[in-house]
Amino acid sequence: MPNFASTPAPVHTLWDTPDMATQRLPGVWWVTTPSHGGFVLSDERQAAMPEALRLDSIYYEEDVNWSLVVIGFEAEFAKLKDQNFDIERDLAHQTARHWRPCQYGAFTGEVITPSDSYVLKKVEILEASIGEIGVRSASGDWADWVPKGKVGVTGQRIAGCDHLGFVRYEGPDFTGLCDAARYDSTRPVNTFAALGVELLPSP
């Protein structure tokens, strides 16, 4: 296992000025800032990240991309004998499998399916919805144009999505109303057809 140099704590980050920085491994800093946080790697560490897991930037944010660093240097982290590392390691694998399935599969050799990954499941649903009108915004009956018990929706046709499940829309805007009980903002996508939207005339 190569020896890596310790580095000074980051003074500036992509997110903000750090208010806390801990060197978890030589050249691997965990920082928090007033706005966000995550891992910051030295240039040496960034070059040593497995190619399948390496990002273009040295910043691996705390919501998802941190998991790539833990997996990439898993053996070194394990050698520290941190009593909580087993939990962190399991969470890292779960996070990467769900949210970075292509990178995780490329690194581990596992075949990741939609049942294993939230992102792949979302992509599957979106690809099945291409051509339909997808909801882009919704308003409750607090809005002056939405009757009581309804949800007002606006949307465009779904043209596709990328590998992370970010939707690409195209064409004109559509506006309509659906029953409030049918609208669920937690779905990966809401289509006008699935909601039974009653289209409103264009302004």
Name these PLM-found stretches.
Residues 1-33:
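Eukaryotic non-globular interaction segments with acidic/serine-rich, low-complexity composition
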Residues 5, 56-59, 89, 93-94:
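Alpha-helical interaction segments
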Residues 15-18, 23-26, 47-56, 64-70, ...:
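Catalytic phosphate/metal-binding cores of nucleic-acid and nucleotide-processing enzymes, i.e., regions
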Residues 29-54, 161-163:
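A short, structured beta-strand/loop element
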Residues 37-39, 58, 149-152:
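Short beta-strand micro-motifs in enzyme catalytic cores
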Residues 42, 60-63:
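Short His-Asn-centered micro-motif
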Residues 63-115, 164-202:
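Short, compact, well-ordered microdomains
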Residues 121-203:
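Eukaryotic intrinsically disordered, low-complexity regions
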